[in-house]
Amino acid sequence: LVPFCVEESSIVAAASNMAKRCLKNGGFKTNNDNPVMIGQIQILDVEDLSVAKEAILTAKYELMAMCNSLPSTMIRLGGGCKDIEVRQIDTMSGPMLIVHLLVDTRDAMGANAVNTMAELVSGKIEEITGGRVHLRILSNLATHRLAKVTAEFTPEELSDDGTRENGSNIIKGILEAHHFAMSDPYRATTHNKGIMNAISAIALACGQDWRAIEAGCHAWASVETGTYTSMTRWEKNDQGNLVGSIETPMAVGTVGGASKVHPVARANLSILGVKSAQELAGIMAAAGIAQNLGAMRALATSGIQAGHMKLHARNM
């Protein structure tokens, strides 16, 4: 059972329907990144950006040791600052150096730990660079913490009448709908909203920071291509089956925050039976891709309103 907290019955119905249809091909397969979050440190008024960048990288292990000197259960369990990256960006306020602390937060979402580390090392970074540290804050674009899910559907499983011909026609319609979302940001916005219908419903049910998750997922949808596009990818393989995948940031936690103290969130995590934040991330991404396919299948066949309004009427 996967708990959803959402006002639309059709969201639950669509995701459940597609989850059933992929069982014969092994269901949803997940392969998630380690739970690494990014802490950003903004450095201004640097005389020589290249020299300052090299100085930070030379002092990397000293800075990491400072981060990991904090008394923390997360660090005792093998988490902590694992690497440091430095980026140069040009802005309307002039060039800046941006330090990224890469922090393994284990089963926590990790915002408080990452922010504490960023503030802790800021003085040392000013000393090393001769610059002025300004902002020190977690990034919600968790590009090192991606949830990755794939699923495969036969034409027979997607058909209305169990025949391969009907299912193949439906797959064609689904791919045409997907290509629309890939190429048009107006369509991609609604397409991705449907994916987040499921992801955010689980996030809310399980006491997660659903606003952070939403922000990260939508930002990631434009990072790779430079334009806003579909969060999912769909294609037909050599067997004529529909193969879908999603790869998106998923900063979730099973310890700390509301997931630990809110009784409903605790109960819902217990229903899920997840043992780690990575497992929760995979389930949420799987629900997202299931919901996406359910919406596209409806749009490509009978239209979205018939099933939606029928379930909507039951709620009234």
Can you annotate each of these PLM segments?
Residues S9, K53, L57, Y61, ...:
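Electropositive phosphate-/nucleotide-binding environments in soluble metabolic enzymes
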Residues A181-A203, G288-Q291, A295-M316:
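Glycine-rich phosphate/diphosphate-binding loops and the adjacent beta-loop-alpha structural elements
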Residues D107-M109, V114-V264:
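Glycine-rich anion/phosphate-binding loop at the beta-strand->alpha-helix junction
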Residues N25-L57, T163-N166, A221-L293:
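A structural-propensity feature for long, helix-poor, extended segments
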Residues L1-G94, V99-L102:
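Small-residue-rich
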Residues G27-D33, L70-D83, I128-N140, R187-T189, ...:
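Flexible, glycine/charged-enriched surface loops at secondary-structure junctions
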Residues E7, L138-L141, T301:
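Short, ordered loop/turn segments at secondary-structure junctions
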Residues N17-K24, A65-N68, E119, G123-G130, ...:
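Short, intrinsically disordered, mixed-charge
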